[in-house]
Regions:
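Bacterial N-terminal signal peptides that target proteins for export
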Residues: 2-11
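Bacterial N-terminal signal peptides
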Residues: 12-20
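Detector for intrinsically disordered, low-structure N-terminal pre-sequences
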Residues: 19, 45, 50, 133-135
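Sec-dependent signal peptide cleavage junction
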Residues: 20-37
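Ser/Thr-glycine-rich phosphate-binding loops at phosphate-binding pockets of nucleotides
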Residues: 299, 303-304
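Cys-dependent protein tyrosine phosphatase-like superfamily
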Residues: 27, 31, 54, 59-293, ...
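Residues at the beta-strand->loop junction immediately N-terminal to the Walker
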Residues: 296
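Intrinsically disordered, low-complexity serine/threonine-rich repeat tracts
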Residues: 33-60
């Protein structure tokens, strides 16, 4: 190669080297900015101190559970309940699958030091003396999931290899989370919940009592276990709102049955009409001797919905709580209620403004009185349903 050729080759190689460096620098400059949502450990580089420090021999932190141990809702329910945009319920459930049942509270006694055994026994109660405790025997695992607890209740529990041994077991205590709804599991029935536990504006610090009024879907397929749970809850009366030819109760022996038919397809007139039916329904609700009651139509959503709406409203529940309860039907198999929420629920709330009263609760009272429900009976309902309320 001549001297001239060597110079030319050197210049070409130099240009190629500079081109590569330039390209690399351009690629580095064009990197997207760091993700602002990343955690500190993701967005910050590791320091020299961190690299050279002694290894951490402590146990790694466990991930926080998706649902707190004191909350009986499923993860999907929990996320929906704590989503401030509660009207966006179809993000979680669309009324096509059975998702309305609670997960319950897990009682895990695997760390209690019990010996290995063929079976285990757990006892739980709402008091530290274990008065009227529930005893569950024959458990093959060292845990048990308890269902249908009340919001905010105390729960005491202990375990052993048998009932006698359990009485000497370690006593655990927790307080159930207070955020509603109080949805329940009744085998063979969908869309079951107690309307209690919500705040009431009728009295400072007031709440809707739990265990008085349950809303459910049709109980036609209720099982023996479901019937037993109805009786365990102390329910005394069933109110069936379906079409007359569908009212085939009673469904549970020992529970009084009353059919108060509000025909299907009457959605546009349910606020203005059916005076006699509403009088009968609210007379039953006012009768403390008939409580607790469970009320249903077919889906436990629309006819059941307006009765529950009026009961919660007249008892001082807030709009957001009443709306959340109404939309929870989406977690059942009874179809989405998002369109009904707009066409019915919101209209009920708006139409109440035409009635006398300074508050929505008093406007709802005026609506009931316009149906022929005596004002004294409305006050009886309030005293019965709202903790701490006394009629003036």
């Amino acid at each position: 190669m001549t001297h001239k050729h060597r110079i030319t080759a050197f210049l070409l190689a130099s240009l190629l080297f500079l081109s590569v460096i330039s390209t690399g620098c351009a690629e580095q400059t064009d990197l997207p900015p760091a993700d602002e949502s990343a955690t500190d450990s993701e967005s910050e580089s590791v320091s020299d101190t961190e690299v050279t420090s002694a290894p951490d021999t402590s146990a790694p932190e466990k991930d926080e559970p998706a649902v707190p141990a004191d909350d009986f809702h499923s993860e999907l329910q929990y996320n929906k309940i704590h989503d401030p945009k509660y009207e966006n319920v179809e993000k979680y459930a669309k009324g096509k699958r059975e998702l309305s049942r609670p997960d319950g509270i897990l009682l895990d006694f695997s760390a209690d030091g019990l010996p290995e055994a063929a079976s285990y026994t757990v006892q739980y109660s709402d008091n530290a003396s274990f008065t009227d405790a529930v005893t569950v025997e024959g458990l093959t695992e060292q845990n048990y999931r308890v269902l249908n607890l009340k919001l905010g209740q105390k729960l005491f529990w202990r375990a052993g290899t048998d009932a006698a041994n359990a009485e000497d077991g370690t006593v655990h205590e927790l307080t159930v989370a207070e955020q509603g709804p109080r949805n329940l599991f009744i085998d063979g029935v969908s869309n079951v919940r107690d309307i209690g536990g919500y705040a009431s504006s009728l009295v400072e610090g007031g709440k809707i009592r739990q265990g008085l009024y349950y809303r459910v879907a049709k109980p036609d397929d209720i099982t023996e276990a479901g019937m037993a749970e109805i009786l365990r809850l102390g329910i005394r009366r069933e109110i069936d709102l379906r079409d007359a030819d569908q009212c085939n109760g009673p469904y549970v022996d020992g529970v009084a049955y009353t059919a108060v038919s509000i025909p299907s397809g009457t959605e546009p007139t349910r606020f203005e009409a059916f005076d006699a039916e509403y009088r009968q329904i609210f007379a039953l609700i006012a009768n403390a001797d008939a409580a607790p009651v469970y009320l249903h139509c077919t889906a436990g959503a629309d006819r059941t919905g307006i009765c529950t709406f009026m009961l919660l409203t007249v008892c001082g529940a807030e709009y957001d709580d009443i709306a959340r309860d109404y939309l929870f039907t989406n977690f059942s198999t009874q179809g989405s209620r998002v369109s009904n929420y707009t066409s019915e629920f919101k209209q009920w709330w708006k139409k109440l403004d035409a009635f006398e009263g300074d508050t929505k609760a008093d406007k709802a009272k005026s609506w009931l009185v316009s149906k022929g429900v005596p004002a004294e009976q409305v006050e009886t309902i309030r005293e019965f349903v709202v903790e701490g309320y006394t009629a003036s």
